[in-house]
Amino acid sequence: MRRLLLLLLAFAAALPAAAPAAPPDFVQAVEFPYYLYPQTLWERELVWLKTVGIRTVEFSIPWNWHQVDGGAEFDFTGATSPRRDLLGFIRLLRRLEMRAWIRPLPPVKGWLNNGYPPGVRQDRKAARPWLHELENLLAPQTEKHGGPIAFVEGSTGINPGFPDAPAPPLPVTVVSAHDPAAMTRSRQALATAAGALLWEDVEDALFPAGWERPGGPLYRAGAVSLNGDERPTVAALRRNAALLRHWGALLPGMKPERAYPVRLAAGKLPPGVTASELVSRAPGVASAVSIVNQSRQPFQHTLRAWDPFAKHSIEIENVHLAPHETLWLPVNVSLGGAGLCRECTAFSNAEHIVYATAELQTVEFENGTLAMEFSAPAPAEAVLQLARRPSGPYLAGGHLAEFDFDEKTLRVRLKIPQGKGPASQIRVALAIEAPEHSAFFEDAKRLIIGRANTVSTSYSSEQLADRSRLRLPEGFAATPTKKSPLGIDYAVDVPADALHGDWANLAIEADGVPLGRAHLQLFRPASVHLPDGIRLHFGATADLAVEPAIIPIDATAGRTVDVNIRNNSPEIQTYAIEPSGDGFQFLPPKSELNSGAVMDRVLELRIFPDGAAPGLHDWVLRFSGGTKLEIPARFLAIPRGQAVAWSADLDGDGSPEWILENQKVRAVFSAQDGGRWLEFTWKDSAPNGLNVLPESGAFAGTGAVEVHAGDGALEFTGKDWKRTVRLAGADASLAVEQNTPLPAETLETGKHNEITLQVSRESATHAAYALVK
């Protein structure tokens, strides 16, 4: 009994199961226009999408973005801008085993000239040379050739063979993550069991300077910020992604049940509540009831649906729905391999989930234990039809709980507690039988990239341990050491090029039968962050950490810099840290830092300028011991009482921004969009400075400008105009002067939290802007 409880605890506490090895047939994709994100964010955000359950990303390929300056040269490798590295992006998708849904032809949403190069007729037939260029590039990257490109949209009739990949399934339902009805609309699409579901506005978008549609936004907010923080609007995507991890493979084999509509057990559905049922074309696989409450009233009733396996109606008792809530309720879901659980071979054809009043996302069976994962916005229950008495015990949310078993009907009722988190997830596990043989992983949670990781396994008998083997992902290796008759430790080597945050699936097998599984996240040995680095702001609430970090420093007194170090390893680590950079002294010059397992530590470095001139200076942090890293960074030396003019590519689009900065404020300008003023930030406002400009900035125009830096000033030259911007050295006053009338802007004197913006327009060609605390 004790071993059975240990097996149950290990299985019930497991992380959510990985998606099936084969990609789901029902396509749920997220729009991911690579050119709208700094390249430094691609890996992080794609790993996040994969983690929540998204396997397909959709994106256009802007013709005028890759045909550099409208000439004959194309950039697909990032030679002119990191965001043009289309091949690198495709390779990243391939490494993550994700799929691409590409749109090779204009129009490109929100993009300059709809994506057409200047002077090219906006006609799809004119795009034949462009398609030919892409075909040569992308043909080896289709799924047919082992690549990630699964779908090509829009080339039919122009180059129908480009490249060798099908069009996405129709109809395509497009849902914005910002839509208050996103959950309802997405579930209505799933209830048809046809086509594809495409999510927009999931990620913050940042247009390269000068490439947004004239008058269009430079920054577009999504459900996930540029810093990786999830906003509440991501909840609908998360729930659908979790649902379709396994249901997605069943949907193409299902059809709407029209002969027996879903209704209440005692009457019609109330106004604002709709319900429909999907049933499997093959008997005894799975059915589901999709119910949507669009009313303002809570719903709590018993539903009557059709059981296609038994060929009679079935009552789903006590269904709870909050206002504007949806549920996907399982009905007659097989516990055998034809249902959601591909490896549940221990169940007969008669054993199935009769129904559940929470969303069933995952079913797993190993070591005699049946585990199910639900999305349960409210307390719920599941009813199982078995062919035997379950041995028990039952765990719900990691806690022992009672379950009801009817000896006559062999039915089990399981109480499901309300779930937690944005997707209301809860995991339950019921021991069905004491296994004849069992094997499991002992507290395995993470693997460190580039290291040999100890993974401990336990077995019910010495003979089973001797016959077992560890199944690993491609590129991994393992060396076993028998620590006891019933235990084996594996030294699992993770490839050095594995991606931080990705996942690896391990399994214990004996005689070809999987006995235990582990879904482990991959981590670098250590993560290093410099929180004092500047951020590029868009309005008052959005910002982007600049990479590599740029840290302002007093050119005389220096400053203290925090280095945040997270030990990702499950063991204590010691790090040797050595900063270096010409023109600066570092105290201490060398440091040794001990960090506990999975623990954050902060190292304080005191930096003293030693001959460094005003402006940008490179420096580097070198780590050895617990990890080997070189972290490049830059200092911005600012003399007291002076303003410094400097330039750097802050948003990773290949075009530098121009900055005026003193000890108090920072003003950022674009060399595109007529010298658009992007940011005016009071630097000492917590947590990352306060920008008083709107997301669209000010002085926006069209076209590139020439920029010259002087002593605390920037000079912008456009067609038939010249503008000079000066920042005072000692205070927060910015003066703007132009030889023609200044572009219209909407800035007004007013308070922004604790900072007041003062606006003074002396004439049509002169204006002054000051920040006062």
Region roles according to the model:
Residues 141, 713-753, 773:
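Acidic, contiguous internal or C-terminal segments within carbohydrate-active enzymes
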Residues 232-493, 497-566, 573, 586-587, ...:
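Non-catalytic C-terminal accessory domains or segments of carbohydrate-active enzymes
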Residues 42-112:
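Aromatic-lined substrate-binding rim segments of carbohydrate-active enzymes
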Residues 27-39, 64-84, 120-129, 155-160, ...:
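The substrate-binding groove and active-site-proximal loops of carbohydrate-active enzymes
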Residues 33, 40, 317, 518-520, ...:
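Acidic-aromatic substrate-binding/catalytic surfaces of carbohydrate-active enzymes
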Residues 91, 95-181, 197:
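Active-site region of glycoside hydrolase catalytic domains
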Residues 184-238, 242, 288-290, 294-295:
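Aromatic/acidic polysaccharide-binding cleft in carbohydrate-active enzymes
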